[in-house]
Amino acid sequence: VYKGKQKYFNSYRLYVNASSLLVMFFALDFPICKKSSQEYYLPGWLKVAPLWQKRLFLASIFGAELTTPRPKLSKKGNFYAPVFSMNKREKFLNNGIRFLEEVSLMCKEFGIEATDLLTRKKYYTKSGDVSWHMELIFSCKPKSLINLWAKIGFIYNNRKSYLANLAVHYLSFKREVI
């Protein structure tokens, strides 16, 4: 229940019983198991990788974790700022902040601005640990939105990808007209 209203969300999992996939993730320096309860950073190889590889990485995590493009109803023609969020246990809060800062720096290479990084206590877990919610908020300036949704976009999420394409076409048309 959130603000007096019952909210329902869909959640999907993929279960793969292949040790080879686990070995590959380990070799690529990706987190294994619960991401909220461990330290991890952007892999070193990714920081020096070509832009196309960085784009694929960002598009895949944005497909899962970046908010869906949606217009502001109060200000016609504008969009809400995209938000990339993650949760971390209190012990790993600084690691989460650093990870989001690394994502922000990688996005700058594509001409995408991040405007804020917010943290707030979310809840206490069953074991009594405090979980923190962190949000990397991107600029809602048209140029930054076009760069985010056109240059990076969303992989593995057809709905977000479709809405992002519509938004890019609208913003590009609006820019030409005005």
Predicted segment positions?
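Internal intein/HINT superfamily modules and their associated LAGLIDADG
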Residues: 1-178
